[in-house]
Swiss-Prot record:
Descriptive protein name: ATP-dependent helicase/nuclease subunit A
Superkingdom to which the source organism belongs: Bacteria
This protein's record includes keyword Cell division: no
Enzyme Commission number(s) from the entry: 3.1.-.-, 5.6.2.4
Catalysed transformations (reactions): Couples ATP hydrolysis with the unwinding of duplex DNA by translocating in the 3'-5' direction; ATP + H2O = ADP + phosphate + H(+)
An MF annotation (GO) of this entry: double-stranded DNA binding
GO biological process, one term: double-strand break repair via homologous recombination
Chain's role: The heterodimer acts as both an ATP-dependent DNA helicase and an ATP-dependent, dual-direction single-stranded exonuclease. Recognizes the chi site generating a DNA molecule suitable for the initiation of homologous recombination. The AddA nuclease domain is required for chi fragment generation; this subunit has the helicase and 3' -> 5' nuclease activities.
Stored InterPro entries: AddA, DNA_helicase_UvrD-like_C, DNA_helicase_UvrD/REP, P-loop_NTPase, PDDEXK-like_dom_sf, PDDEXK_AddAB-type, Restrct_endonuc-II-like, UvrD-like_ATP-bd
Length: 1220
C-alpha cells in the first residue's frame, strides 16, 4: 500500500509512487533528468527506515563500480543522519554496521562473490584469479589456432567451403574474426550451446524461412508503397504542366509495373528483381521550361518525386530482392553445412577455451556470469536450491540502468527474485531511450517487453513513468519532444514516443527564451581548409558566440552569470575529428580538452616502435621493415631503398633484396656500410629478444637509439614521451600474464588494434578546470552541461557491419551470404538479406537513442551543428517535411546521418517558403506546449563566416605592445600587480634565451651582438611590434609579397627534377602545371613564379653537377646541440638546441655539398664588381652558412662544402668563406 503523499514533500506523484510501490515487480521508466538516482536512493532508505529491512537484505545492482560506490556512500550518509536524529534506534545502529556488508555493486561483483562462496559446486580451485586483458586475448587466439588446426587437418568438405568463403589466399584472418564474433554473441546468451545449435534451423526449416520471408516482404512493402506515393505525386504534377507527354508516358509504364509488382497486396519478387528503368528520363527541354515559365518549381518537384520513386524501388532491388524469393530460399539448404560447421567450431572454441582457463586457474568476466548462472540454475532451466536460498536472503532486488542488461544477466536476476511479475520483488529503473550499448550485447528488448506488459495499476507488473525533467529549460525539452515524436516509433526506434515518453518541464528556470539552434554550414570549395577543418572553425566560432553573448541562469539566486568555458561541451559520435577541433581552438586561444585516448596506435612514435618490434620478430614483412629503415632512427632515403629493390625486383621480400644488394659488385660502398650497420643492429635485437622479456627489448631500443630523447624534443614532446612509456608499461603488464615472447606481445597489440582499444597519455581534467570539453555521446551519459554543442551531424552512420559475409543477431541468429566456390562469386541468401535489414533497423534505432542522449544533456541551450557541400543537399530533406506527421518509415530507414532526420523535421519552420504541393497540414503554432519546437535554423556559408572573423579581428586586433601599455583605472589593483611583476628573477638571461633556436634566429642574435645591440632588446622589440600572419582562408586574394614569392620559389626548387640532358622551357612549364594538379602549389601561383630565373638555374653548372651526383637529399631538417657546433661557448653557458632546414644536399665522389637557395633582390651599385658583390652577399649569410656547415659536419662526420645560389646573381661557392 502506497502511503499518502504529504503536501510539503519535494517528490512528484510519480516519484512518490516509485519510492513506495511494492507487492509486484516494478519497472520505472525514468526519462532523462527525472531524478532516477535520487528516487532509487530514497527507495532504499525508506525500505530501511519505514519497512525496517536490513540493508544487507537488499541487492542493489548498478552498471559501473563508480555508480555503486557513489550510491553506497549516499545510502550510508542518510543512515548516519537518521541514526544521529534518533540515537536510541537500535535498528539504525545495526544498519551503520551492516552497510559495509551490503550488496550494492555491479552484477559482475555479485557473481564473483557467488563463485567465491560456492566454488565447490563448480569444481574449481578456490585460489582462482581474474585473467588480465592480455592473457584473455592471447589465450582465446591460441584456442582458435588449435581448433582451426584440427579442422584443417580433417579437411571436412563443409569446412573447406567455409574456409574458401571466409579466407583469402594469404590469410584466414577474416574467418578468425567471424569465429570471435560468434563466440562473443554466444556467451552473451544464457545457454551458449543451445543458441549455437539453433543457428542452423532457418537453413533447414521451411517454416523458419517463411518467417524470414514475411519479415523481408513487410519491409520491402514499406518502400514499394513509398515508391507508389512518389510516382503518383510525380504523375499529378506533370499532369498540371504543359508539354510533358513523354514524362507522363514513362510514368504510366512505371505505374503499370508497380500495379503488377504489388497485385493483390503480394509482392512479385521475380518481377521486381528483373525490372529495369529507362536509361534516361526525358529531360525538361527549353521548350517545356518556356511553356511552364511560372511553374518551374513544380517542374523540379515533379522530377524530384520521380527520382524518389526510382530510389525506393532500387532500394528494394538492391537490398531486399536482387534475386527472387525462390532463388533466395534455394541457397539456404546449400549453406546449412557451412553454418553447422561454424557453429561446431565455436562450440569447440568455447570448450577448449574453458579448459585452458581452468588449467591456468583463471576466470574472465564472461565466466563470472555463466558460473553464477550454473550455481543458480539447473540444466532444465529451474532454479537450484542455492538460488532458493538467495531468494529468501533478499527482500528486494533493485536494478539501475536496466535498459543495458543482457539476457545472461536477466536470467541471473530471474533465478534469485521471488514470485512472478504480479507479486515479485524486482525493482527496475532505466530509460530505454538511453539504451546505447548494443555493441556490448545490451538488449533493450528486455526493457521494451516489460514496458509493454506492465500496467500502471500493477495487475501485470507495475509500470511507472518518470517524465518530469529537472535539468533543462522548456525550449530544450519541447524541441526534443517535437523531434522524437516525428522520428521514433516501434518500427524505427523500437518504442513509441507518446505522451508517456515525453519530457515535461520541472526545473525553476525563468521565462527568458533559449531556442535550439540548428546551424548548418555550407562548405567553401575555394578554401584551403578541408570540410572538417571548416566545421571545426565554425564550432569554435559558436563557442566564442556563447562566451560573448550568452548567460547562465543560477537557480539558487534567480540571477544570471557570465558563462565559463567549463559550461560548454562538444558532443560527437566519436573522436575522429578531435585533432581539427584542437587546432581550431588553439588558433583562438580557447582552453580545450578531449577526454580520449583514441588514435594512440596511429601516433608516429608508437608506429615506429611497433614497426621495430614486428621487424625484429619477422623481417619478412616489407611494410614494417621499410618503415623502420625510412624512419628517423635509420634514415634510409627513398632513393636508397629504390636502388636496393631495383637490384632484385623479383624477390618476394625486401629483406631478400637487401641480401642481394650486399652481394652486388656495383653496390654503393656507403649504402653497403649503412645496410651492414642496420643488419648488425637487427641481429643484435633478435638475439636479445630470445633471452629477454619484451619490455627490456623496448627499453634497450629506447636507450640505444635515443628514441625518448628524440621525440621529447618534437612538438607535443610530453605527450609523445608518455605514449612511448605507455607502450613500455603495456609490455610489463603483458609479462605479468602467463604468456611470453615477442610474437605473443605483437599478437596482443594487434587484437587491441582490431578491437579499437587505445591506451595513451593520461591527461585527466577535473570537473572544475575551466576548459571546453569534447567527449563522445557515450561518455556524456549521466552528465549535464549548461551549453551543449552537438556536432558532426553530417557524419555518416557506420553501416560496415551490414556488408559482412556473416551477420549475427541474438533473436534471429545468423545470416550468411552464399558463396559459390566453383564460380568464385557471392550471392545474398534469404537469411543474409533478412538479417541485414533487421540489423539496419536496429542500428538506426540505436543512433536515434544516441541523439536523444546528446540532446538531453543540455540545461540552458542546445546548438546542433552539421555541414553540407552545397545548399541543394538540404532540398531532399525539405521535401520530406510535408506534414506534421511522423517521417516516413522508408525515409528513416535510408537516412545516412543525424542531420537528415533533424533537418527534415525542423525544416517545417520553412513551410511558408515551400512550393504549393509541400504545404503542411496544420500550423506549427497550434501544437501543445510540450511538443512545440522552439528552434532557429541557420544556414551559413563558410566563406561569409571566415570574412566575419576577418573583420572582427581587424576591429579587435591589438599588438603585444597595446596590451603591455594598457592603462588600468583600478590603481589599487594595478599596484598589487606591479608589486608582483617588479620581482627580479636572478636568472633572467636564461629565461629570455629559448631552449630551441632556429639557425635564422641565431644569425639575428649574433649580428645584433656584433653591432653592440642587446639581442634581448631586439627580440622584445620584434615581439611587441609584430602581428601574426592571418590564415589563408581568412585572406582576400592579394598580390603575393616578396617573402611569399620566396616560399613559392623554394617549393618549385624542392620538387625540381635533376636530369643531365637538362629541362626545356616547355618541360618546365609542364612540371609547374603538375605541381598545381597535385595541389603542391596554388592554382593562381603560376604568374608569380619567376620562370626565367628557374631556367637560368637549370642552365647553370651547379644544376648539371647536382644532376650528375651520386645522391640527392632535399629539404633536409636537422636538430643539433649548439655546443657541438659552436666551439666558442663557455662551459657555464646553458646549451640550446639548434634546428634548421637545408634546401638541398648532394654527394659526389664521396664529398658532401649543400645548397641554399636565395631569392634576395638587390641593386648592384656603380663601380662594384661582381666579385665584390659576391663577397658582400657571402658576408650577409656567413653566420647562417657556418651553422649549416658545422651541423652537417657534426652529423655526417665528414668535411662538407657549400653553395649559395642567388636567383638574381648566380652561384657562390662558400669554400673560401672564413669559418668563425
Amino acid at each position: 500500500m502506497i502511503p499518502e503523499k504529504p503536501n510539503d514533500v519535494i517528490w512528484t506523484d510519480d516519484q512518490w509512487k516509485s519510492i513506495y510501490a511494492k507487492g509486484q515487480d516494478t519497472l520505472v521508466a525514468a526519462a532523462a533528468g527525472s531524478g532516477k538516482t535520487a528516487v532509487l536512493v530514497e527507495r532504499i532508505i525508506q525500505r530501511i527506515l519505514r519497512d525496517e529491512i536490513d540493508v544487507d537484505r537488499l541487492l542493489v545492482v548498478t552498471f559501473t563500480n563508480l555508480s555503486a560506490r557513489e550510491m553506497k556512500h549516499r545510502v550510508e550518509k542518510r543512515i548516519q543522519k537518521a541514526s544521529l536524529e534518533d540515537p536510541s534506534n537500535t535498528h539504525l545502529k545495526n544498519q551503520r554496521v551492516k552497510i559495509h556488508q551490503a550488496q550494492i555493486s555491479t552484477l559482475h561483483s555479485f557473481c564473483l562473490k557467488l563463485i567465491q562462496q560456492h566454488y565447490d559446486v563448480l569444481d574449481i580451485d578456490p585460489n582462482f584469479r581474474t585473467s588480465s586483458e592480455a592473457e584473455n586475448i592471447l589465450l582465446l587466439e591460441q584456442t582458435i589456432d588449435e581448433v582451426l588446426e584440427k579442422y584443417y587437418a580433417e579437411l571436412n568438405p563443409a569446412f573447406i567451403d567455409l574456409s574458401e568463403q571466409l579466407s583469402s589466399d594469404r590469410s584466414d584472418e577474416r574467418l578468425r574474426q567471424i569465429i570471435k564474433s560468434v563466440y562473443y554473441f554466444a556467451v552473451a546468451n544464457p545457454q551458449p550451446e543451445q543458441w549455437l545449435k539453433s543457428l542452423v534451423s532457418p537453413y533447414k526449416d521451411n517454416q523458419a524461412q517463411d518467417e524470414f520471408l514475411e519479415l523481408l516482404m513487410n519491409l520491402a512493402k514499406v518502400f514499394m508503397n513509398t515508391a507508389l506515393e512518389n510516382l503518383n505525386k510525380s504523375f499529378d504534377l506533370y499532369s498540371e504542366l504543359a508539354g510533358c507527354d513523354k514524362q507522363l508516358e514513362v510514368i504510366e509504364d512505371e505505374r503499370a509495373f508497380i500495379a503488377r509488382a504489388m497485385e493483390g497486396g503480394i509482392l512479385n519478387t521475380e518481377l521486381i528483381s528483373k525490372h529495369s528503368f529507362i536509361s534516361r528520363f526525358p529531360s525538361a527541354t527549353k521548350k517545356i521550361k518556356e511553356a511552364n515559365d511560372g511553374n518551374l518549381e513544380l517542374l523540379e518537384s515533379a522530377k524530384a518525386y520521380y527520382d524518389d520513386y526510382k530510389g525506393a524501388v532500387e532500394k528494394v532491388q538492391q537490398d531486399y530482392f536482387s534475386r527472387s524469393a525462390e532463388d533466395l530460399k534455394a541457397d539456404m539448404a546449400k549453406l546449412a553445412p557451412r553454418v553447422e560447421v561454424l557453429s561446431q567450431i565455436t562450440r569447440d572454441v568455447i570448450d577448449t577455451f574453458s579448459k585452458k582457463k581452468r588449467s591456468r586457474n583463471i576466470l574472465d568476466f564472461s565466466d563470472y556470469e555463466h558460473f553464477a548462472l550454473k550455481i543458480l540454475m539447473n540444466e532444465d532451466g529451474t532454479p537450484t536450491d542455492l538460488a532458493k536460498h538467495y531468494r529468501n536472503g533478499f527482500d528486494e532486488i533493485l536494478v539501475d540502468e536496466y535498459q543495458d542488461t543482457n539476457r545472461v544477466q536477466e536470467q541471473i536476476l530471474s533465478c534469485i527474485k521471488r514470485g512472478d511479475e504480479t507479486d515479485g520483488n524486482l525493482f527496475m529503473v532505466g530509460d530505454v531511450k538511453q539504451s546505447i550499448y548494443k555493441f556490448r550485447q545490451a538488449d533493450p528488448s528486455l526493457f521494451i517487453e516489460k514496458y509493454s506488459r506492465f500496467s500502471h495499476d500493477g495487475t501485470t507488473g507495475m509500470r511507472i513513468d518518470l517524465s518530469q525533467n529537472f535539468r533543462s529549460r522548456p525550449e530544450v525539452l519541447s524541441t526534443t519532444n517535437y523531434l522524437f515524436k516525428h522520428m521514433m516509433d516501434e518500427s524505427v526506434g523500437e518504442i513509441i514516443y507518446d505522451e508517456a515518453a515525453q519530457l515535461y518541464y520541472g526545473a525553476p528556470f525563468d521565462d527568458k527564451p533559449h531556442p535550439l539552434n540548428l546551424n548548418v554550414m555550407v562548405e567553401d570549395k575555394e578554401s584551403e581548409l578541408t570540410g572538417t577543418e571548416q566545421e571545426a572553425e565554425y564550432i569554435a566560432n559558436q563557442v566564442e558566440e556563447i562566451m560573448n553573448h550568452r548567460e547562465v541562469y543560477d537557480m539558487g539566486t534567480g540571477s544570471y552569470r557570465k558563462p565559463s568555458y567549463k559550461d560548454i561541451v562538444i558532443l560527437e559520435r566519436g573522436y575522429n575529428r578531435s585533432r581539427e577541433l584542437q587546432q581550431a581552438f588553439k588558433n583562438r586561444d580557447i582552453p580545450f580538452h578531449v577526454n580520449s585516448k583514441e588514435g594512440y596506435f596511429e601516433q608516429t612514435e608508437v608506429r615506429l616502435v611497433l614497426s621495430f618490434l614486428r621487424t625484429v620478430d619477422n623481417p619478412l614483412q616489407d611494410i614494417y621493415l621499410v618503415g623502420l629503415m625510412r624512419s628517423v632512427i635509420y634514415q634510409f632515403t627513398e632513393d636508397e631503398l629504390a636502388r636496393i629493390r631495383v637490384t632484385s625486383p623479383n624477390d618476394d621480400y625486401f629483406y631478400q633484396s637487401i641480401q642481394h644488394y650486399l652481394k652486388t659488385k656495383e653496390a654503393d660502398p656507403d649504402l653497403v656500410a649503412k645496410l651492414q650497420d642496420f643488419l648488425k643492429d637487427l641481429k643484435f635485437y633478435q638475439e636479445f629478444s630470445l633471452e629477454h622479456p619484451v619490455y627490456q627489448l623496448i627499453d634497450r631500443f629506447y636507450n640505444n637509439r635515443l628514441v625518448i630523447q628524440y621525440f621529447s624534443g618534437m612538438i607535443g614532446g610530453k605527450g609523445r614521451r608518455a605514449n612511448l612509456y605507455g607502450l613500455y608499461n603495456k609490455a610489463i603488464e603483458f609479462e605479468n600474464s602467463s604468456f611470453r615472447g615477442l610474437f605473443q606481445f605483437i599478437r596482443f597489440i594487434d587484437e587491441l588494434i582490431d578491437r579499437g582499444k587505445d591506451f595513451g597519455e593520461e591527461n585527466v581534467v577535473g570537473p572544475n578546470d575551466d576548459v571546453v570539453r569534447m567527449m563522445t555521446i557515450h561518455a556524456s551519459k549521466g552528465l549535464e552541461f549548461p551549453f551543449v554543442i552537438y556536432s558532426g551531424l553530417s557524419k555518416s552512420f557506420n553501416r560496415s557491419d551490414l556488408y559482412k559475409p556473416v551477420i549475427l543477431n541474438q533473436k534471429y541468429g545468423m545470416g550468411m551470404t552464399y558463396f559459390d566456390v566453383e564460380k568464385d562469386f557471392a550471392f545474398p541468401s534469404l537469411a543474409s538479406v533478412t538479417l541485414r535489414a533487421i540489423t539496419e533497423k536496429e542500428m538506426i534505432s540505436e543512433e536515434m537513442r544516441l541523439m536523444y542522449v546528446a540532446l538531453t544533456r543540455a540545461k540552458e541551450q542546445l546548438f546542433l551543428v552539421g555541414r553540407v557541400k552545397a545548399e541543394k543537399e538540404l532540398d531532399k530533406m525539405l521535401n520530406t517535411a510535408i506534414s506534421n506527421n511522423m517521417l516516413p518509415m522508408s525515409y528513416r530507414l535510408e537516412v545516412k546521418n543525424p542531420l537528415q532526420l533533424i533537418y527534415a523535421i525542423l525544416a517545417k519552420y520553412q513551410a511558408n517558403h515551400l512550393t504549393n504541393d509541400l504545404k503542411f497540414e496544420r500550423n506549427i503554432d497550434e501544437l501543445d506546449d510540450a511538443i512545440h519546437p522552439y528552434a532557429e535554423i541557420h544556414i551559413d556559408e563558410y566563406s561569409d563566416i571566415a570574412q566575419d572573423i576577418h573583420q572582427n579581428e581587424d576591429e579587435e586586433f591589438r599588438t603585444v605592445n597595446d596590451i603591455v601599455n594598457y592603462q588600468s583605472t583600478n590603481t589599487e589593483r594595478q599596484q598589487a600587480i606591479e608589486t608582483q611583476l617588479d620581482y627580479q628573477y636572478p636568472y633572467q638571461k636564461d629565461v629570455v634565451k629559448p631552449t630551441k633556436q632556429s639557425v635564422s634566429e641565431l644569425k639575428r642574435q649574433l649580428e645584433t651582438e656584433e653591432t653592440g645591440t642587446s639581442y634581448e632588446r631586439v627580440r622584445q622589440y620584434q615581439l611587441g611590434a609584430s602581428t601574426y600572419e592571418r590564415p589563408k582562408f581568412m585572406r582576400q586574394h592579394k598580390k603575393r609579397k616578396a617573402n611569399e614569392i620566396g616560399t613559392l620559389m623554394h617549393t618549385v626548387m624542392q620538387h625540381l627534377p635533376f636530369k643531365e640532358e637538362r629541362m626545356t622551357s616547355a618541360e618546365l612549364d609542364e612540371y609547374i602545371d603538375g605541381l598545381i594538379e597535385k595541389n603542391i602549389i596554388e592554382d593562381d601561383a603560376k604568374p608569380d613564379i619567376r620562370m626565367d630565373e628557374v631556367m637560368n638555374f637549370i642552365k647553370s653548372d651547379l644544376y648539371l653537377e647536382i644532376a650528375q651526383s651520386d645522391q640527392i637529399m632535399r629539404e633536409m631538417p636537422f636538430v643539433v646541440n649548439q655546443s657541438k657546433v659552436d666551439h666558442q661557448m663557455n662551459d657555464d653557458e646553458d646549451v640550446s638546441i639548434i634546428q634548421g632546414m637545408i634546401d638541398l644536399i648532394y654527394r659526389k665522389d664521396n664529398q658532401y655539398y649543400f645548397v641554399d637557395y636565395k631569392t634576395d633582390t638587390f641593386n648592384q651599385r656603380r663601380g662594384v664588381s661582381d666579385e665584390e658583390l659576391g663577397e658582400q652577399l657571402k658576408a650577409r649569410y656567413k653566420i647562417q652558412m657556418y651553422y649549416y656547415r658545422s651541423a652537417l659536419e657534426t652529423i655526417l662526420q665528414k668535411e662538407v662544402k657549400g653553395y649559395l645560389y642567388f636567383f638574381k646573381f648566380g652561384t657562390l661557392s662558400l669554400e673560401e668563406t672564413e669559418k668563425h
